[in-house]
C-alpha cells in the first residue's frame, strides 16, 4: 500500500503514472467490527489533487519502476550488495566504510540519509554514534 505522498514523490521522479496505472486505487475505506461494517468513507482524489489517497502495488513493481527510472539518471550511482558497516564524522563530511562481496571500500559524503528499509543496517550505526547527534536532531 502506497500513500498519496509517496505518489507525489514518484511524480517528481517521473514514475507516478506508471505506479498508479499498475496499482489498484482505493476508492472506499471501510471499518469493520467482526462481520459488521461500522463506517465507510470516500478515498477518491480530493478536489485539486492529482493522486488518490492510496494504491495497492506489489513492492517488486515499485522497485523495478524506480530502478528503470534511475538508469535514465546519470547523476545517480546505484550500487547493489553494498552495506555500510561504519561511519566516521569529519569536520565537513562523513566517511563511510562499505562492505561488498568483492571487499570493503571507503566513501566520503557531505550527507548520509538512511533509506535502507525496516531492517536498516545504517540507522543502528547512526544511533550509537553521538557524533551524529546535532542540535537539529535534539530539538
Give the label of every model feature segment.
Residues 1-71, 88:
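Active-site-adjacent segment of FAD-dependent monooxygenases/related oxidoreductases
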Residues 20, 77-79:
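General small-molecule cofactor/ligand-binding pocket signal
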Residues 32, 97-101:
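A generic structural motif
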Residues 72, 93, 103-105:
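A conserved hydrophobic secondary-structure block that centers on an alpha-helix together
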Residues 80-95:
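A conserved short coil-to-beta-strand element within the FAD-binding core of flavoproteins
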Residues 102-111, 115:
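Core beta-strand elements of the Rossmann-like FAD/NAD(P) dinucleotide-binding domain
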Residues 114-129:
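Flavin (primarily FAD) binding-site architecture
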Residues 136-139:
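Pore- or pathway-lining transmembrane helices of multi-pass membrane proteins that form conduits
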